[in-house]
Design a protein with these regions (language model features):
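Short functional hotspots at interaction and active-site rims
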Residues: 1-274
Length: 274
């Protein structure tokens, strides 16, 4: 310490003389190839592979730091394996090829999702060693179906049905809620489901001057309203409404927060011009 004080005028530690080289640097390409062929390996599994296959002992933090420095993050989006079936793949390719020619202001994407009076966030925080317990209804709750359309500039024709969706309920929605909002030349896209094909649905849409097209099977990624539902359900879990009336009011409030720019972003993300 006396020598440091004499030399620098300070008793602080001397600055480092250089940057230590990571032992993973020599295995860089191997690490890239590993996650390219097995992308869902955990840090612990990669660490174990290094030890067995490369005789290299490192900590999981070192493995994380290596991939983080090379902008390789841990993530995964799940798509239906059925998308690889020849008939489904052909239908998806045809729909994607058509996307650029569609006029976004004329498009209306319809879908429905279930909502309940027992929705709650699935995770939270508490001290280590303690359990985080949340109370939700287990014996009595209500399940409803929220159905709506998405246009380039906002939500349209929102409606809540008591219980699950069936053919007669969907037909009533189309005739009484959706059809009055349609204009000449509109194209209504919806999932290729039996309940969406009951007698009267296509006729009601056609009578309003619009046409109906069904999305390819196993293709939620081609329906931009799916992203709205993800946001909606996250907000519903946050507020955790416990009565039917409170849930209705909350859905109505959340619909108003979906801005036009946000809708356009959803269209673009699904591959449509906006």
């Amino acid at each position: 310490m006396d020598q440091t004080l004499d030399a620098t005028g300070s008793i602080g530690a001397l600055p480092g003389t250089g940057h230590s080289r990571s032992p993973l640097k020599a295995r860089e390409q191997w690490l890239f190839d590993l996650v390219a062929t097995e992308p869902d390996l955990t840090l612990a599994e990669i660490r174990a592979r290094l030890r067995v296959e490369k005789k290299l002992k490192v900590g999981t933090t070192s493995v994380w730091r290596f991939y983080n420095c090379h902008e390789t993050t841990f993530k995964k989006t799940l798509h239906a394996a059925e998308q690889d079936r020849p008939d489904v793949a052909a239908a998806r390719a045809a729909r994607k090829a058509e996307q650029a020619s569609l006029k976004a202001p004329r498009l209306v994407f319809i879908d429905e999702t279930s909502v309940t009076t027992k929705m709650v966030r699935h995770y939270g925080r508490c001290p280590v060693g303690e359990r985080l317990v949340a109370k939700v209804p287990h014996g009595h709750w209500k399940t409803m179906t929220f159905i709506a359309g998405l246009r380039i500039d906002g939500m349209t024709a929102p409606y809540v049905i008591d219980g699950s969706m069936d053919g007669p309920s969907f037909l009533a929605y189309v005739e009484q809620v959706l059809a009055p909002t349609l204009h000449d030349g509109d194209i209504v896209f919806m999932d290729n489901l039996r309940t969406h094909k009951v007698d009267g649905v296509a006729a009601a849409i056609k009578a309003a001057g619009a046409s109906v097209r069904y999305l390819p099977a196993y293709s939620p990624d081609l329906n931009p309203i799916e992203m709205v539902f993800v946001k909606l359900k996250a907000a519903l879990r946050k507020d955790a409404a416990r009565t039917v009336e409170a849930l209705w009011k909350l859905i109505g409030k959340l619909i108003k927060t979906i801005a036009p720019d946000e809708c356009a972003n959803y269209f673009r993300h699904a591959g449509y011009k906006a």
